[in-house]
């Protein structure tokens, strides 16, 4: 239920250039230690905000009932006060009172497959190659680019990011390389080898469902050049031509409990265990995909976004993955490329910073051809497939096929304007887009719904995310007034501006640690830890409605013309991600086909219309020049 974790909004960040590229030992620790600790907000403040957030999404009777429960919860000396004190004690003892709980509840205890339900896919711009040579050359350059970024992490010279003048926690950058999720029966874990005594020097390459260990550093510690990597990729490609191999990787796409059982039988065999260890330890994974069926240009982006998110099923590339791996870059022969990442380790922005760096790097011309030195043959990772494992693979194939058939995903490139228009109106582009989403949803369904937009808590040490609730009394007043003929246009403009400003104010509160969602989660988990009976406010209908996010959304801004995508977090909801560029906006919209009420193409259409109608409204009523 908590897979909504992920979706992180961060405004474009200012970067501090490192003063030198020498190893700055201890610089990372000093930076991290100086960050403020995540506060526990005052109890009454969070409960007031909770009641306010319920108004647009529950009935008056439900709200009145919840108000009673909230009043009981916060009586002097009552259960709320006791739990609040417990949280405050926890905050004094820990580096971050939330991060460990959040990692467990949002990710590691989440039992649905990571594919679609948790791990975001990233669709990158189509490259201009159309053959094997081009595919391998680009993959080699991409690998070189990631290693270039890794050197900044290793040397602690990564530019510190800022948000609103405040330095941000950089810890997630140290979690995304040489790391992997490991399935467990009730709870998964994450292993990270970046800081181990002997950090890994290899990556994993997958082709035709076959896994290889490719060393990307020479014995003297210098990285291979893209020319040298290209030669190694050719060797891998040539030694994995047979396409009838069992797709062991598809096991990682299954329900976490099923995968945990299959995993324990898989690694009983020493050969398998060593192969799995190699994948888990590798710096990252590169998937050399086979071409997908040709489709018309207008559905191409949606089709390829699916490849990045889930691999297209067992007949295509879903077996050409190890979905537990934190970073998997995907390069196909037809020029399509992207990535998929396992969400437990990090939110979108650090991933996007890496992607931006790598995509810039791939455009650099090769100035000198590097000398061709003899390089060892990349090591093929062997798997011994027992009948039991073969059976597990068959089940995983069937399951992913059902999941993919159920996913309705639509890419929309909104060409009419980008960040430029809201900025010209002195409005926040993110808030403008969120209010357009509210308008689109209201026009389809005639009501508001619980809406999740992630806010970054990286101003705080080890901060992850909190929730911006985009459905507000102000947004509801606007969406009702927008199509009401009795409301004059000038008043609609005022309602629109008020709604956008209210969203902006909520965002500012959230990034300063003053939103209520994670606080309520903390109180609930504190109750479980203290073995007290679950307080009534968490057993209430309003709470269930508030946590049923029909719109799960995320702004993930990038310099690269790309977009992230993920599945809805509820069966009757939408997953919406967007990257606002200067003059256009990239959207991905997902829904489930099994829900008759939701439809990704219809939502995309209504979203486009909402954005255009809001622009027209503002253009017809220009603000007086001050």
Curated annotation (Swiss-Prot):
UniProt short sequence motif Microbody targeting signal, positions renumbered to this chain: 624-626
Compartments where located: Endoplasmic reticulum; Peroxisome; Mitochondrion inner membrane
Enzyme Commission code(s) on record: 2.3.1.137, 2.3.1.7
Outcome reported for the amino acid change (mutating residue 343 to A): Loss of enzyme activity
Residues that, per the record, bind CoA: 419, 423-430, 456, 504, 555
Membrane topology of this protein: Peripheral membrane protein
PROSITE patterns linked to this entry: ACYLTRANSF_C_1, ACYLTRANSF_C_2
PTM-bearing positions, type N6-acetyllysine: 261, 268
A cellular-component GO term for this protein: mitochondrion
Entry-linked InterPro entries: Carn_acyl_trans (IPR000542), CAT-like_dom_sf (IPR023213), Cho/carn_acyl_trans (IPR039551), Cho/carn_acyl_trans_2 (IPR042231)
Residue positions binding (R)-carnitine: 452, 454, 465
Reactions mediated catalytically: (R)-carnitine + acetyl-CoA = O-acetyl-(R)-carnitine + CoA; propanoyl-CoA + (R)-carnitine = O-propanoyl-(R)-carnitine + CoA; butanoyl-CoA + (R)-carnitine = O-butanoyl-(R)-carnitine + CoA; hexanoyl-CoA + (R)-carnitine = O-hexanoyl-(R)-carnitine + CoA
Expression across tissues: Expressed in flagella of epididymal sperm.
Keywords associated with the record: Acetylation, Acyltransferase, Endoplasmic reticulum, Fatty acid metabolism, Lipid metabolism, Membrane, Mitochondrion, Mitochondrion inner membrane, Peroxisome, Transferase, Transport
GO function terms (MF aspect): acyl-CoA oxidase activity; carnitine O-acetyltransferase activity; carnitine O-octanoyltransferase activity
Active site (UniProt): 343
Residues bearing the modification N6-succinyllysine: 93, 261
One GO term (biological process): fatty acid metabolic process
Subunit structure of this chain's protein: Monomer.
Job description of the protein: Catalyzes the reversible transfer of acyl groups from carnitine to coenzyme A (CoA) and regulates the acyl-CoA/CoA ratio. Also plays a crucial role in the transport of fatty acids for beta-oxidation. Responsible for the synthesis of short- and branched-chain acylcarnitines. Active towards some branched-chain amino acid oxidation pathway (BCAAO) intermediates. Trans-2-enoyl-CoAs and 2-methylacyl-CoAs are poor substrates.
Family per similarity comment: Belongs to the carnitine/choline acetyltransferase family.
PANTHER family in alphabetical order: CARNITINE O-ACETYLTRANSFERASE (PTHR22589:SF50), CARNITINE O-ACYLTRANSFERASE (PTHR22589)
Protein name listed in UniProt: Carnitine O-acetyltransferase
């Amino acid at each position: 239920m908590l897979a909504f974790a992920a979706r992180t909004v961060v405004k474009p960040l200012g970067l501090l250039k490192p003063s030198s590229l020498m190893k700055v030992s201890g610089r990372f620790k000093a930076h991290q230690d100086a960050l403020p600790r995540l506060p526990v907000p005052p109890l009454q403040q969070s409960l007031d905000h909770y009641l306010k957030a319920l108004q647009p999404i529950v009935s008056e009777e439900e709200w009145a009932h919840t108000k009673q429960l909230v009043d009981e919860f916060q009586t002097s000396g009552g259960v709320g006060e006791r739990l609040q004190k417990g949280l405050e004690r926890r905050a004094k003892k820990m580096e971050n009172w939330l991060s460990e709980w959040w990692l467990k509840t949002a990710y590691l205890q989440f039992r649905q497959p990571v594919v679609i339900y948790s791990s975001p896919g990233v669709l990158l711009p189509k490259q201009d190659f159309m053959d094997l040579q081009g595919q391998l050359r680009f993959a080699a350059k991409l690998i070189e680019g990631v290693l270039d970024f890794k050197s900044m992490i290793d040397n602690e010279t990564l530019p510190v990011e800022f948000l609103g003048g405040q330095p941000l926690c950089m810890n997630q950058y140290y979690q995304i390389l040489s790391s992997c999720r490991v399935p467990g029966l009730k709870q998964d874990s994450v292993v990270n080898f970046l800081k181990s005594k002997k950090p890994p020097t290899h990556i994993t390459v997958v082709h035709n469902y076959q896994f290889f260990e490719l060393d990307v550093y020479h014995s003297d510690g210098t990285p291979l050049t893209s020319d040298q990597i290209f030669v190694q990729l050719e060797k891998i490609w040539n030694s994995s031509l047979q396409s009838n191999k069992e797709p062991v990787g598809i096991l990682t796409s299954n329900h976490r409990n099923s995968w945990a059982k299959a995993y324990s039988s898989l690694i009983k065999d020493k050969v398998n265990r060593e192969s799995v260890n190699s994948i888990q330890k590798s710096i990252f994974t590169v998937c050399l995909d086979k071409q997908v069926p040709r489709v018309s240009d207008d559905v191409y982006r949606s089709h390829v976004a699916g490849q990045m998110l889930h691999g297209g099923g067992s007949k295509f590339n879903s077996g050409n993955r190890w979905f537990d791996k934190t970073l998997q870059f995907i390069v196909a022969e037809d020029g399509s490329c992207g990535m998929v990442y396992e969400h437990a380790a990090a939110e979108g922005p650090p991933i996007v910073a890496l992607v931006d760096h790598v995509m810039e790097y791939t455009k650099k011309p090769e100035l000198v051809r590097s000398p061709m030195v003899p390089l060892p043959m990349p090591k093929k990772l062997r798997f011994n497939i027992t009948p039991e494992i073969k059976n597990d693979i068959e089940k995983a194939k069937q399951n992913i096929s059902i999941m993919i058939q159920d996913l309705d995903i639509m890419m929309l490139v909104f060409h009419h304007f980008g960040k430029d228009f809201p900025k010209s109106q002195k409005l926040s582009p993110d808030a403008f887009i969120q209010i357009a989403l509210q308008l689109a949803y209201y026009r389809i369904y005639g009501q508001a719904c619980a809406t999740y937009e992630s806010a970054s808590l990286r101003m705080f040490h080890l901060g992850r995310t909190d929730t911006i609730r985009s459905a507000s009394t102000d947004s509801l007043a606007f969406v009702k007034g927008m199509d009401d003929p009795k409301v004059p246009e000038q008043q609609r403009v005022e309602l629109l501006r008020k709604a956008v400003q209210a969203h902006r104010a909520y965002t500012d509160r959230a990034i300063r640690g003053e939103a209520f969602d994670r606080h309520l989660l903390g109180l609930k988990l504190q109750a479980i830890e203290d073995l007290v009976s679950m307080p009534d406010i968490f057993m209430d209908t309003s709470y269930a409605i508030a946590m049923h996010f029909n719109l799960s959304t995320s702004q993930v801004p990038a310099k690269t013309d790309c977009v992230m995508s993920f599945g809805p977090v509820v069966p009757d909801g939408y997953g919406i991600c967007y990257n606002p560029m200067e003059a256009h906006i990239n959207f991905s919209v997902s829904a489930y086909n099994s829900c008759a009420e939701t439809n990704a193409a219809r939502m995309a259409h209504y979203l486009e219309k909402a954005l255009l109608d809001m622009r027209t409204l503002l253009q017809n009523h220009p603000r007086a020049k001050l």
